[in-house]
Amino acid sequence: MAKAHIELTINGHPVEALVEPRTLLIHFIREQQNLTGAHIGCDTSHCGACTVDLDGMSVKSCTMFAVQANGASITTIEGMAAPDGTLSALQEGFRMMHGLQCGYCTPGMIMRSHRLLQENPSPTEAEIRFGIGGNLCRCTGYQNIVKAIQYAAAKINGVPFEEAAE
């Protein structure tokens, strides 16, 4: 099969590559770009472990071909921290609020949460739960994930984080 030439930006870096037209974006990111933070959980768009930010949208990268991302700007979990390694507000929130256990869903959950906070900087708990509804976590029960997102929203908005009474 003839390979297709693609040009895109990943985590702020220009990328040119030859890919087979049937290569899924998640496989291109992990195998050809060696960015293994996004995980393959189901390969059927159900779990969200492969979520990346593509041109300002959350995308499950197992649902699109790499050639469809030609010309796009993609951010993966590796692109979330500052160049000096300082964690983003969301990464810090997940760490501080214990928003992970096994960690498998965490990269996709953070990427989806990042887009959620871009769209709604001060979401309610219900809006957070709805916003992350397409990303599955089999370990945490979501409560600490919700707290992590609330923590990040407070930090981004420059207000103190106050945990809701349980």
From Swiss-Prot:
Q: What is its EC number?
A: 1.2.5.3
Q: Which residues bind [2Fe-2S] cluster 1?
A: C42, C47, C50, C62
Q: What does the UniProt keyword field contain?
A: 2Fe-2S, Iron, Iron-sulfur, Metal-binding, Oxidoreductase, Plasmid
Ranges that cross the membrane: none
- Domain (2Fe-2S ferredoxin-type): residue spans on this chain: 4-80
Against Pfam families, the record matches this protein to: Fer2, Fer2_2
The note on cofactor binding and number reads: Binds 2 [2Fe-2S] clusters.
What PROSITE patterns does the entry give?
2FE2S_FER_2
Q: Which cysteines are joined by disulfide bonds?
A: none
Under catalytic activity, the entry for this protein gives: CO + a quinone + H2O = a quinol + CO2
- Sorted alphabetically, which PANTHER family does this protein's record hold? OXIDOREDUCTASE WITH IRON-SULFUR SUBUNIT (PTHR44379:SF5)
Q: How does it assemble?
A: Dimer of heterotrimers. Each heterotrimer consists of a large, a medium and a small subunit.
Q: What is this protein called?
A: Carbon monoxide dehydrogenase small chain
**Source organism of this protein record:** Afipia carboxidovorans (strain ATCC 49405 / DSM 1227 / KCTC 32145 / OM5)
